[in-house]
Curated annotation (Swiss-Prot):
Annotated region described as Disordered, given as residue ranges: 48-73
Segments forming a coiled coil: none
Organism: Rattus norvegicus (Rat)
GO biological process, one term: eukaryotic translation initiation factor 2 complex assembly
Quaternary data: Interacts with the eIF2 complex gamma subunit EIF2S3 (via C-terminus); the interaction is direct. Interacts with the eIF2 complex alpha subunit EIF2S1. Interacts with the eIF2 complex beta subunit EIF2S2.
Biased composition, class Acidic residues, residue ranges: 60-73
Protein name: Translation initiation factor eIF2 assembly protein
GO cellular component, one term: cytoplasm
Record GO terms (molecular function): ATP binding; magnesium ion binding; protein folding chaperone
Length: 336
């Protein structure tokens, strides 16, 4: 995998080419000060919200005591930076997409941070919602700090213009998502995306699903993407229509799901796990799904559910983070 392959999978690199096949989205340049804020792990305080003013005062008439209270309160308050111009741009984009969005950076979405949201969802209605997810996500940090870590060429790192991608929120059923692996412009493998769960309809319809994805690939993607080796994600709706969701590099930086990268990069045939009828077709990809509830596995995102911020809380190292987190949760409840 080369650095240019990673660059070609940035959202802004492929979206103009395949706009009609995917979910409506808006791309906004990410200001440097916003990037700096997102990478600052010193505080969990999130910008974009105002705390309500304090209405009560100590009942004691002792002025010195009141003054001391005020000083302590001031010292304990952490102030988040504000980005009024960027906030306006983001809110206008969110409104244009129906009021709710799925956010991501150039490559990754903060899927590992869903647990921190009020509704355990990546659905965002404001910049502060996005900031909370981004600042809690290792995937987002990876985009910023190590996008080319698995590349094997020695060329200089391409210059990356970071962008906030806002995708119109759609309620997608996990059992209808699939990841597809393309090698030398040939579709070689299809994997159930949410492999931690068993879906009866996938097992029953896998040959139909496989043909549907093959047709989509041949008509819309084959020989049209910027590279001959790549990974793409699709969603197949209840009517059988296939929607393009994302592109990923063909390499270890991308989760191979029910395959292994050793299998995908070797010269061996992957089609040993499909029906005999399909195996007779030269172009038939391997199709893998979770075949029974016995093989259900825990979610791969569970390991991301305990961030350093909360470890700090458990050891008493940073109580300010708990205060800021509770304030944010309170404001979210008031907005709802």
């Amino acid at each position: 995998m080369k650095k240019e392959h990673v660059s070609h999978c940035q959202f802004s690199a492929w979206y103009p080419l395949f706009r009609s096949l995917t979910i409506k989205s808006v791309i906004l340049p990410l200001p440097q000060n916003v990037k700096d804020y997102l990478l600052d792990d010193g505080t969990l305080v999130v910008s974009g919200r105002e705390d309500p003013p304090t209405c009560s005062q100590p009942d004691s008439g002792d002025e010195a005591e009141e003054t001391q209270w005020s000083d302590d309160e001031s010292t304990a308050t952490l102030t988040a930076p504000e980005f009024p111009e960027f906030n306006t741009q983001v809110q206008e984009a969110i409104n244009s997409l129906g009021g709710s969005v799925f956010p991501k950076l150039n490559w990754s979405a903060p899927r590992d941070a869903y647990w921190i949201a009020m509704n355990s969802s990546l659905k965002c209605k404001s910049l502060s919602d996005i900031f909370l997810l981004f600042k809690s996500s290792d995937f987002i940090t990876h985009d910023f700090t190590q996008p080319f870590i698995h590349c094997n060429d020695d060329s200089p790192d391409p210059c990356i213009e970071y962008e906030l991608v806002l995708r119109k929120w759609c309620e997608l059923i996990p059992g209808a998502e699939f990841r597809c692996f393309v090698k030398e412009n040939k579709l070689i493998g299809i994997s159930q995306r949410d492999y931690t769960q068993y879906y009866d309809h996938i097992s029953k319809q896998k040959e139909e699903i496989c043909r549907c994805i093959q047709d989509f690939f041949k008509e819309h993607l084959q020989y049209k993407f910027l590279d001959e080796d790549f990974v793409f994600d699709i969603y197949r709706d209840s009517r059988g229509k296939v929607w393009l969701i994302d592109f990923n590099p063909f390499g270890e930086v991308t989760d191979s799901l029910l395959f292994t990268w050793e299998e995908l990069t070797s010269e061996n045939n992957l089609r040993g796990d499909v029906s005999e009828a399909d195996a007779l077709e030269q172009d038939s990809p391997a199709f893998r799904c979770t075949n029974s509830e016995v093989t259900v596995q825990p979610s791969p995102y569970l390991s991301y559910g305990l961030p350093k911020d909360f470890v700090d809380l458990s050891t008493g190292e940073d109580a300010h983070k708990l205060i800021d987190f509770l304030k944010l949760k309170r404001n979210q409840q008031e907005d709802d």
